[in-house]
């Protein structure tokens, strides 16, 4: 009986050890898989934005994550986009998001506040459409309008979906007053890429100015955008001194 009890206890102990090992192996694999599907939490990646409250930019090898946290006042939802460089590999966990290949070759913007950033970066020639072009007063961009390089695309409230689909720009940069924007929904359903820009919600001058980094990221001109913003920051600081 003692011998039988001994073997039974030994068998139960070995079974316990085996189950314990299997548990830790399974747990280890679970943790490893969890890390693999959350690459955006890599350590050491910092937000490139300092002053703007509604914008975050995180740069990774081969792609950039742009997060719009305040596209309109009282916004409850964040909008996250992935800017994919040529041959850049996007993690599976990010493929459900809007992916925009960069650098852009054509763009439609919807606010006159977007025009100066394009001109400072030297990419105004990529502008192919704008709502209410009569509102644009910039000499550089007006020349593009006058020669027919920038098309009229309706109004902000009712963008001309048919014209935009025909143009097929790489990206439409829009803005919203709230989360009810059926025109934007229709454009996205048509396969067009749309990104919200919330520069108009910023309360500080430097916060508004820092959105040039948003456009810099779209064109792969991050360094140029940073240099321009540093000059703006310096001039603003000197003015206050």
Regions inferred by a protein language model and the residue ranges of each:
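Bacterial Sec-exported substrate-binding components of ABC uptake systems
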Residues: 33-115, 224-241
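Short N-terminal helix-initiation segments at or just after the protein's N-terminus
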Residues: 44-53, 157-159, 197-201
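Generic signal for short, ordered secondary-structure residues
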Residues: 12, 97, 143-144, 166, ...
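Extracytoplasmic substrate-binding proteins
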Residues: 106, 149, 166-175, 180-241
């Amino acid at each position: 009986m003692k011998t039988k009890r001994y073997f039974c206890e030994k068998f139960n102990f070995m079974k316990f050890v085996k189950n314990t090992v299997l548990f830790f192996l399974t747990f280890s694999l679970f943790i490893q898989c969890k890390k693999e599907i959350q690459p955006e939490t890599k350590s050491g990646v910092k937000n490139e934005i300092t002053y703007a409250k509604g914008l975050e930019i995180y740069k990774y090898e081969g792609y950039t994550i742009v997060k719009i946290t305040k596209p309109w006042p009282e916004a409850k939802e964040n909008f996250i986009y992935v800017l994919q460089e040529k041959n850049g590999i996007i993690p599976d966990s990010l493929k459900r998001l809007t992916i925009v290949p960069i650098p852009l070759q054509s763009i439609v913007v919807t606010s006159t506040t977007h025009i100066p950033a394009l001109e400072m970066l030297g990419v105004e020639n990529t502008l192919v459409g704008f709502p209410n072009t009569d509102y644009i007063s910039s000499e550089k961009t007006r020349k593009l309008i006058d020669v027919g390089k920038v098309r009229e695309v309706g109004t902000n409230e009712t963008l001309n979906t048919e014209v935009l689909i025909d143009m097929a720009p790489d990206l439409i940069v829009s803005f919203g007053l709230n989360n009810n924007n059926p025109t934007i929904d229709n454009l996205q359903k048509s396969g067009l890429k749309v990104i919200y820009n919330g520069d108009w919600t910023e309360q500080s001058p430097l916060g508004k100015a820092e959105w040039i980094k948003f456009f810099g990221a779209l064109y792969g001109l991050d360094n140029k955008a940073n240099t321009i913003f540093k000059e703006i920051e310096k001039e603003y600081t000197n003015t206050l001194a």
